[in-house]
């Protein structure tokens, strides 16, 4: 783990405690995945739409990037870091792991 990644259990604990209320949680899954279940405080931004939404994202907020298993979110995290975003954190394991810790 580094400053640009967080384990799902640690993320879930912060989420439950309200420690992420000022953060931007970006869910990069597809809409059908989102509809099957998502975090109330998350924003749906499918991976393929991220480039066109760069200008609308707030570089001053910490962003937590989630997907189904942590692969797409890792790629989006790397993309955002490469485009000048510094406060970007990939949630390892994605919703598959997060759900275990929020149940």
Residue ranges, per PLM feature:
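Rhodanese-like catalytic fold shared by cysteine-dependent sulfurtransferases
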Residues: 1-24, 30-62, 71-103
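Short, surface-exposed ligand- or partner-binding patches at beta-edge/loop junctions that are enriched
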Residues: 65-66
């Amino acid at each position: 783990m580094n400053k640009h990644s967080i384990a799902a259990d640690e993320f879930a604990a912060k989420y439950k405690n309200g420690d992420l209320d000022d953060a931007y949680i970006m869910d990069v899954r597809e809409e059908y995945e989102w509809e099957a279940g998502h975090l109330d405080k998350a924003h749906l931004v499918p991976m393929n739409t991220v480039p066109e939404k760069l200008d609308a994202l707030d570089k001053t907020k910490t962003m937590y990037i989630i997907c189904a298993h942590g692969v797409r979110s890792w790629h989006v995290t790397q993309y955002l870091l490469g485009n000048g975003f510094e406060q970007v954190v990939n949630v390892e394991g994605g919703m598959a792991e997060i759900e275990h810790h929020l149940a």
